[in-house]
């Protein structure tokens, strides 16, 4: 699996359930308009959140 589109609209804390499917995941919560590095990491999942800490786009691996 490479993304979790069903997490859009849920809180970042609730979205951390990704760990149930991917225990090795390194979860990063970042504001939706933040600049992030372009490097690719197989274990990293970024949760892009709005000001109310809700996920605003599908959480991709990378």
From Swiss-Prot:
One of its GO terms (molecular function) is serine-type endopeptidase inhibitor activity. GO terms for biological process: response to wounding. PROSITE patterns: POTATO_INHIBITOR. The keyword NAD does not apply. Keywords: Protease inhibitor, Serine protease inhibitor. The keyword Nucleotidyltransferase does not apply. Belongs to the protease inhibitor I13 (potato type I serine protease inhibitor) family. This is Subtilisin inhibitor.
